[in-house]
């Protein structure tokens, strides 16, 4: 089905036929959120040509920043859960940018910042929480992507993880 939305709102399927992506989201029990209002002087995404640059999204739990530092107050599994939660928020923003997730041709790149101690070395495993969900939703040909994962000393609002992405759309 064709997904028509107004910016900053969640997706509403326009007919009885769900797209394969909408079906995957439903089977995973995922409802995409509305685009969150920026916390500073930036926009949630920029579309130029066929590329969409989605601004960094921080991990949230119960609507508040998911605060913590990997290697001190959080372990890898909790970090992965935070990264997966971010992926859901990123998908909501990407849907607003593209008009329909079925228009996504490729997740090009994911960049992850992990609030971690100097001795924590599993940023790549934390980021898998996001990467794996993108592949689950889009399949390996569209969802697999280039990626960077960095350990950083701090993230805005004390969040444990921040992730941004670049996607190619129709």
Tell what function each PLM region has.
Residues 17-170:
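Short, polar/acidic, helix-capping and beta-turn segments at strand->helix junctions
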């Amino acid at each position: 089905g064709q997904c028509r939305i107004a910016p900053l709102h969640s997706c509403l399927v326009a007919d009885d036929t769900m797209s394969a992506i909408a079906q995957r989201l439903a089977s995973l029990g995922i409802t995409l959120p509305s685009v969150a209002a920026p916390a500073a002087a930036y926009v949630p995404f920029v579309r130029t040509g066929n590329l969409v640059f989605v601004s960094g999204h921080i991990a949230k739990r119960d609507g508040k920043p998911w605060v913590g530092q990997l290697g001190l107050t959080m372990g890898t599994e909790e970090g992965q859960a935070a990264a997966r939660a971010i992926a859901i928020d990123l998908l909501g923003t990407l849907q607003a940018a593209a008009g329909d997730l079925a228009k996504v041709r490729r997740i090009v790149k994911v960049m992850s910042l992990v609030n971690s101690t100097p001795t924590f070395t599993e940023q790549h495993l934390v980021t898998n929480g996001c990467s794996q969900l993108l592949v689950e939703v889009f399949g390996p040909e569209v969802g697999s992507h280039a990626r960077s994962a960095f350990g950083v000393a701090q993230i805005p609002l004390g969040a444990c993880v921040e992730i941004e992405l670049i996607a190619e759309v129709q």
